[in-house]
Amino acid sequence: MSAAEIKTNTDQKMQKSLESLKSSLAKIRSGRANPGILEHIHVDYYGNPTPLSQVASLGLADARTINVQPFEKTMVAAVEKAIRDSDLGLNPASQGTVIRVPMPALTEERRRELTKVVKSEGEDTKIAVRNLRRDANEHLKRLTKDKEISEDEERRATDEIQKMTDKAVVDIDKIIVEKEKEIMTV
């Protein structure tokens, strides 16, 4: 593996870490309605646990209400039960073939708990990014030791990987601040 391949590989893994952070934060409920928080819910579809997004369309009715419309009328009760039984503390109400999921306002205490969870997720992602940097640097050192790349190439690649790490950490901080602001906005 060359230095360029190591850099490309490390950059791709760092981007995946950022995407993973974004998707895990999307599941954290803020005061506003966001169909993304329902995506991890699985519905019993003819005996098979199936993601909600595959058995129903999700949309927003207004800023605090999510509309869930099952593709089959027979699935309304199962979808409603799956949402109610989830760990989100939501109380869906069916109106014919549409299920309305109102988002209750968060208490101040709950908002603070959620910001702690968000910070923790961010720190975990930063640790993952730093571990990727460490692995890449170790790989570069091995290549230098085996005389596959020069020390100058190693130093250049190490500097570029450090810049990628710094950029990823700044991006993580931006994502965290944005999510905290979203949670704390009443």
UniProtKB/Swiss-Prot annotation:
Q: Which NCBIfam families does this UniProt record tie to the protein?
A: frr
**Keyword Methyltransferase belongs to the record:** no
Supply one GO CC term from the record.
cytosol
Q: What is this protein called?
A: Ribosome-recycling factor
- Keyword Oxidoreductase listed: no
Species annotation: Polynucleobacter asymbioticus (strain DSM 18221 / CIP 109841 / QLW-P1DMWA-1)
Q: Cite the entry's keywords alphabetically.
A: Cytoplasm, Protein biosynthesis
- Annotated InterPro entries: Ribosome_recyc_fac, Ribosome_recyc_fac_dom, RRF_sf
| Gene behind this protein | frr
Localization annotation: Cytoplasm
Q: What is its main location?
A: cytoplasm
